[in-house]
Every structure is written in structure tokens, then in C-alpha cells.
Amino acid sequence: MAETDIRAGSGITALRVTAAALFAGFNLVPLYGLVAWHWDAFQLLLLYWGETAILFVCTLAHIACIPPAQLGTMVVNGKSVPASRLMMVGFFAVHGGLFLAGHLFFLCVLFSGAKLAHIGGVAGFVHTFFIASGAWAPLLLVALAGALDVLTGPYHPAFIDAFARVLHVALARPKDAVPGQAVGSVVGGLYVRVIIMQVALIFGAFAATVVGSAAPLVILVVLKTAVDFVIRLSAISGAPPAPLWSGVQPTLRG
């Protein structure tokens, strides 16, 4: 039983490390884009905006997996009511969606120059800056890594627990937090990371524009890659043990 427990724990940890490696791979692709594809500051900022959008969707998925008892309360029509998953996901979908829209508008106003003059609407924008530019490839890595994060996170979909029970393994969840604290830990980490990273990247883009060189962007990409990887590995090493043996004896059928 202990051997099965260790194998399951190693498997979960391996998936989490794989997610961290995929994020690192995403962060390194812009270096190739800057050198080989001649990406400019605007293209790089749009790429990282796309990363933020994907991580935001993954955050909504994390919230949808938090037990209702840990969601806390919300004020509806002046009354405090127990929050539901649908309420929380809906609230942060609107809040985060407005944030992403405002952020994109800000980037376009400051860094697009004349690039948007002949784009031809939203479809042309997506095709030019996310398909034809090659940005879709690193963003695919982010989507895969985000999916692994959701599946192996402390609050994961119910079918993961069902699959674990088939293997006679119970996945450990974090200790019950103060109602509302679980949501704060999931959402707060994303917003803090996004604000710090995006401010640094925007200043780097300004510097690259002023000096007329991609060197500041290259330095920022390398630093972002290192910081992201260290943060994710630290989170993995500090996570509670993933599997706990359920105590259910497997039944052999002849």
C-alpha cells in the first residue's frame, strides 16, 4: 500500500513539475520570437496579455472546484447570502473580463502605433497578432500547463477524485480554510502576479522603444522565466502531500 501511495504521489508531483516546465517553455519562446520572428514590444505585450487571459480562465476553473462551504458570503440586494460557485465564478468573470479588456485597450493605445490601421476588425486582429505571428504556439503551452494546474491543484474537479478512488487512493485536500479565504488565495495570487509582471514588462517595452534595441525586452523575458519557474517550484515543494492511502482494500475478481 505504501508503495502505491508513493507512486501516486510521484505521479502527481511529476505532473506539477511538467506544468512548471511548460510555463518555462512558454516564457522562453519569446526569446526566439524577438530574434528570429522580429517581434516588437507590442507583439510581446500581446503575447503576455494572452497568457494572462488563459491564466484567468484557469483561475475561474479553480474557483469552480472550491467546496461551497469555503466560498464565504456575498452581498446580494443589500443582504449577505452564502456564496455559490456560480455566483463566485460569475462575479470574477465580469471583474476579470473588464480588467482584461481595459488592459488590452491600454496596450493598444500606448504601443500599437500604426499597426492597427489596416487590421480589419477583431478577426483580423486575432489572425495578425496571435495566428500569423506564431504566438499561438507558446499560448498553447500555457493552456496545457494551466489545465495540468487545475487537474492537480488542491481544489480539483470531482472526476479526479473519482479516478483516484478507482486506484484506491484518496487525494489530500488542504485543511478547511476560513470561509472566503480559499477564494482569496486563488484570486489574490493571480492579480498580484499579473500586476507586478505587467508593470515590469510595460516599463521594459518603454525602455526598448527609447533605446531602439530589444535588449531590455530580452533581459525581462529571461528574468520573468526565472521568477515564474522559481515561484512554481516553490509552490510544488510547499504543497501538502498529494495522495493519502484511502484504506480501501482492492478486490480481485477472477
Task: Specify the residue positions occupied by each region the protein language model found.
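Short, amphipathic, aromatic/basic-enriched membrane-interface segments that mark the entry/exit
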Residues: 7-21, 183-192
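The first (N-terminal) embedded transmembrane alpha-helix
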Residues: 18-33, 44
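Extracellular/periplasmic helix-loop-helix junctions in multi-pass membrane proteins
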Residues: 23, 200-223, 237-241
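Hydrophobic core segments of alpha-helical transmembrane domains in multi-pass membrane proteins
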Residues: 30, 44-55, 139-142, 214-226
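Hydrophobic/aromatic-rich structural module bridging two neighboring secondary-structure elements via a short loop
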Residues: 42-108
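Juxtamembrane inter-helical linkers in multi-pass membrane proteins
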Residues: 68-83, 154-189, 243, 247
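Membrane-proximal helix-loop-helix units in multi-pass membrane proteins
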Residues: 101-176
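Short, highly charged, low-complexity non-transmembrane loops/tails of multi-pass membrane proteins
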Residues: 234-254
